[in-house]
Amino acid sequence: MFLLDPFSGISGDMFLSAMIDFVDKEDFINTIKKVIDVEIEIKKVKKCHILANKVNIIPKCINCNANTYKDIKNVIKSSDIQEDIKITALEILKILAEAESKVHNVDVENVHFHEVGNYDTIADIVGAAYIINKLNLKNNCLYKPINVGNGFVRTEHGLLPVPAPATAEILKGLKIFFSDINEELTTPTGSAIIKYINPKLAKGAFIIKEVSYGAGDKDLNLLNALRVFRVEDIKREDIVLLETNVDDISAEILGYLYEVLDGKVRDLHFIPTYMKKNRPAYTIRAIVDRDIAEEVAKIIMRETGSLGVRIFDIERITADREFKTIKLFDESVRLKVGRVNDEIISQKPEFEDLKNIAKKYGIPLKDLYKLINISQIKN
């Protein structure tokens, strides 16, 4: 897995430079050249005395003047590159065009890119599409907050605030920060690339496997580079804890809540407690996947009458889990096997499987658990 660290912003060429060591350089260059006639130079440079990669795009093409959405789209569409790379490139270009269309209030097909566009943007987009597909980055990448810089940037429309309007539009939903450097550190193309990748905000602990730096063009007091980590994610789950207190609810309703939330929650607890004025109550706690936390919170409020549910970000390190099947009285019983560092730490039978055997053969459930334990020891 890769983690993007745009502590000094992100641009198209910074992304290519940071990722170039992780892909086949010759295939990368040939893919871009199938779209646009350019020379591509890959070299090592130093930024703030730190060694970094630099990908330079040098024009020698007759179609370098393509700078409208329609023109660039046609250049990419008519190229003979791998279809999935072509689709990704067109999607990144579309993100750029739709942002420009919105901030300038023009039809997307008539968008003129002005500062972006021309040979370098085409190469950046196609190169990024190549990298994204070869490394499977889409929806499978992490990032840290993006440094957008500060101050103003000069355009043909005049001075515009940083981030530029199109960049700000693209960055919606991503975590950014302003620094004390009065420069445009994050460009529209860089924003469109990271927006398309749709990374998750990096949280928790990781093991670093490799580090790469992609140099930018600016010379700043800050290291002007995009840093990329290839990391091994310590096995965690993206989960949240929902919690609320209720003091006017019956045990029957709580039992029904179990049924309603079956299949939606990882775990559900009802904890007896006392509230103000010594009122007996329950604390309801549910562990859920982040993407359905709001849905589950609303179910809890609707079913219990609670006026609010607290949401806590939590981390949970988990063992590797797998199922294996054993035979008991010629019936199949699934065992959930837990491992840490390839060492088996637990083997637990599925309750429903044992319950069915207990009913079928008239054997106490507790005796079946004992037989399972003996069977595991023998195996």
Swiss-Prot record:
Keyword hit for Iron-sulfur: no
Entry protein name: Putative nickel insertion protein
GO-annotated molecular function: lyase activity; nickel cation binding
UniProt xrefs under Pfam families: Ni_insertion
Key words of the record: Nickel
Family to which the UniProt record says this protein belongs: Belongs to the LarC family.
Gene3D superfamilies: mk0293 like domain, Transcriptional regulatory protein pf0864 domain like
